[in-house]
Curated annotation (Swiss-Prot):
UniProt-annotated catalytic positions: D315
Oligomeric and partner information: Monomer.
Protein name (Swiss-Prot/TrEMBL): 3-phosphoshikimate 1-carboxyvinyltransferase
Pathway: Metabolic intermediate biosynthesis; chorismate biosynthesis; chorismate from D-erythrose 4-phosphate and phosphoenolpyruvate: step 6/7
Compartment(s) of residence: Cytoplasm
Length: 430
């Protein structure tokens, strides 16, 4: 599908966001490991969380929606999963594959985890290494999926104290889930904090030791049946926060947005660039902070982004690059080499696409240098590289660029935000 975007005169209205993808994945997996019925309110229809739900069903877990759309998942406890009769298809979802691998590593039956062509190119040694250190028997194909996990011995996995070599919520969560099946205390040590949904939702002990976070899974930790309420996805909100900032005479409202501090570094970056964003009605929903956001048009200035900020805005860097291209002055993004092993090489994809729109971009091994010249992009033909975040970031760029922008393979936005293009059109004023 080719999506056509014309320059917008303004953006107005209240944005309808999809449910938070990260929390949705975890709600399905943890509900499967609980004992009894859990309910998930606002579970999304986007492709990635559906991949997780499909895998849970393949493991013998009953899950379905009632007439009000509430998802009920009937968990069978840590030892109640059934051997899968077919490979566990994770689709395009790295979160599904990495977190599910932690669960499967502790089972007394074997499993194979696979995914689409893109997912089979993403690195999986980063989860295989700690799982093998716990005694899991895992085979990869040249460091990638399919992942073959052989049956675990009845005495369980070995406990592990694991220091994350890089900040990664997926690797951390994989080890924590495997730790539920270990014969002793498992500790994951973070030097740089990453998103913390897993430890929040599991209710794990977290200790601050010498500037590091120690997340602890005790041998006897159980997973209760819980009713989860999934807030709006902050990563989905990010596109409208940047769009509402860049398009003149705009005012957008985003309600019930997840505001987990490990996810919202974009707010700090945009504030530092000069954005006009307010957060109101802050509250706690389950284990997660939630609030309502209003964004109004503002002129931006360049900024330096790197270090400990990066793990807490890694998904937002493509749309930050759009903001930087429309700001006045230089923006430097560094320490973001993780973006080279996402659904596509996001650093290269954004550099290529923004240059096509007339931006001045230098690509570095771990980031980008963008010399902004105000909102002076020119419409052009660009490609999503079949990456949902690239597609949506370029949709935002198209709203600002003079003329018409076309985005090829734009249907991939449905991976995380099925109604994105309709929502963008609905709030746009020509």
């Amino acid at each position: 599908m080719v999506q056509t975007i014309d320059q917008a005169a303004s953006l107005r209205g209240t944005v309808s966001l999809p449910a938070d993808k990260s929390i949705s994945h975890r709600s399905a997996l943890l509900s499967a490991l609980g004992t009894g019925r859990s309910r998930v309110y606002n579970f999304p229809d986007s492709a990635d969380p559906q991949s997780t739900l499909d895998c849970v069903r393949t493991l013998g877990i009953e899950a379905g929606r009632n007439d009000e759309g509430v998802l009920a998942i009937h968990g069978r406890g840590l030892g109640g999963l059934h051997p899968p009769s077919e490979p566990l298809d994770c689709g395009n979802s790295g979160t599904t594959m990495r977190l599910l691998s932690g669960m499967m590593a502790g089972q007394e039956f074997g499993s194979v985890l696979t995914g689409d062509e893109s997912l089979q190119q993403r690195p999986m040694e980063r989860i295989a290494d700690p799982l093998q250190a716990m005694g899991a028997r895992i085979d990869l194909r040249s460091g990638h999926a399919p992942i073959r996990i052989r049956p675990q011995r009845s005495d369980g996995l070995r406990p592990l104290e694991y220091r994350l070599p890089v900040a990664s919520a997926q690797v951390k969560s994989c080890v924590l889930l495997a730790g539920l099946y270990a014969s002793g205390r498992t500790v994951v040590i973070e030097t740089t904090p990453s998103r913390d949904h897993t430890e929040r939702m599991l209710g794990l002990e977290v200790q601050e030791v010498g500037g590091e976070r120690h997340i602890i899974v005790e041998e006897d930790h159980t997973v209760p049946a819980v009713d989860w309420s999934v807030p709006g996805d902050f990563s989905g909100a990010a596109f409208f926060l940047v769009a509402g900032t860049l398009v003149p005479d705009s005012e957008l409202h985003l309600d019930d947005v997840g505001l987990n501090p490990s996810r919202t570094a974009l707010l700090d970056v945009l504030d530092g660039m000069g954005a006009d964003i307010t957060v109101e009605n802050e509250r706690v929903q389950g284990s997660e902070p939630v609030g309502d956001i209003t964004v109004r048009s503002a002129s931006l200035s360049g900024i330096d982004i790197g270090g400990r900020l990066i793990p807490n805005l890694i998904d937002e860097i493509p749309v930050i690059a759009v903001a930087a291209a429309c700001a006045e002055g230089r923006t430097e993004i560094r320490d973001a080499e993780e973006l080279r092993v996402k659904e596509t090489d996001r650093l290269h994809a954004m550099a290529q696409n923004l240059e096509a729109l007339g931006a001045k971009v230098q690509e570095r091994e771990d980031g980008l240098i963008i010399d902004g010249n105000g909102p002076n992009l020119l419409g052009a033909a660009v490609t999503s590289h079949d990456d949902h975040r690239i597609a949506m970031a370029m949709g935002v760029a198209g709203l600002v660029a003079h003329g018409t922008t076309t985005i090829s393979d734009a249907e991939c936005a449905r991976v995380s935000f099925p109604g994105f293009w309709d929502e963008l059109s609905r709030v746009s004023v020509s």
